[in-house]
Amino acid sequence: MHIVTLRDPSAPVVAQYAPSAGMIGISLTDSGVELLGQRAGLDAYLAAGKTMGIPVLYPWANRLGGHNYTVGGEEIALAADAFGVRTDPNGLPLHGLLAGYPGWKVMTESANELTAELDFAADSALLASFPFPHLLVVRVTLADRSVTVRSTVSAIGDKPVPLCFGFHPYLRVPEVPRAEWVIETPRLRHLLLDDEGLPTGEAEEQPPIYESLGDKSFDDGYDEVPEGAVFAVSGGGRRIEVHFEQGYPAAQIFAPPGEDVVCFEPMAAPTDALRRGGYRFAHPGQPAVAVFSIRV
């Protein structure tokens, strides 16, 4: 497997990506110290879609409320055995179709930048579950202690492409107990969820958070995320920030009990938006761009 190693030209920060394993970020180190949650590792991600590192959640992030959705009057069914479809413990489709997907093509690779492309139009198995021909280009740049991930969706043909994707960076503050980590968020709108993790339709305003993680757990959805919003986790003199720079108006915060990880997930639309609507499109001739960065 080809592993791409990116090095910050001005700092001892190194990132590694595996394009042929789903264009997943597998490592981010500062002076050799790992800052990404490895969980069960890359092998489990490839074998069973068990997320780790910085996986791509595409074409939808988080879960869908059922195995079908409608776009522009066209109803699409997700067959239980369809390529790439994985489900959560409640049987709901989870995190899109691209876990471990090998069809990414590396376009450019340098000491601190990687660009890879996925042609949805070239894969009938992907089109069966997401019938919107398009190109997805992901460019990763490492500079000034920041990993910047820029995604561009370009429609091919005359069908607009729903934008419901996201990323799932697993962050950790090494050598500091989880209970002592401090998390920070901007003002957000908290989406209330049901027992299956789906929005109920109710929401409440949430003021900015600055608090110790303690023994708390999160699996919470948000929208109205302002452009440029900063989420952070810190401890022991170390601070890791996730910047929602462009194109990510929704978020999920995930901090499971018993795991030394916290996730601030940039999302182009809230959970289950592909079924409920309210998302944006990449229209023909008008590529859509979304950018987030992780600063260490």
Where is each model-derived feature located?
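Short, Gly/Pro- and small/polar-rich lid/capping loops
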Residues: M1-A11
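Acidic-aromatic substrate-binding/catalytic surfaces of carbohydrate-active enzymes
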Residues: V14-A82
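Active-site/ligand-binding surface loops and adjacent short beta/alpha elements
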Residues: P160-P162, P169-E245
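A short, structured loop/turn motif at beta-sheet edges
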Residues: T70-E74, V106-L114, T141-S146, E175-E180, ...
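Extended, loop-rich substrate-binding clefts of extracytoplasmic carbohydrate-active enzymes
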Residues: A82, R86-A143
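Short Pro-Gly-centered flexible turn/kink motifs
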Residues: Y69-L78, S151, F281-V296
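Acidic, contiguous internal or C-terminal segments within carbohydrate-active enzymes
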Residues: L6-D8, Q16-P19, L28, F120-L163, ...
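Glycine-rich active-site loops that engage anionic ligands at enzyme catalytic sites
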Residues: V233-P266, T271
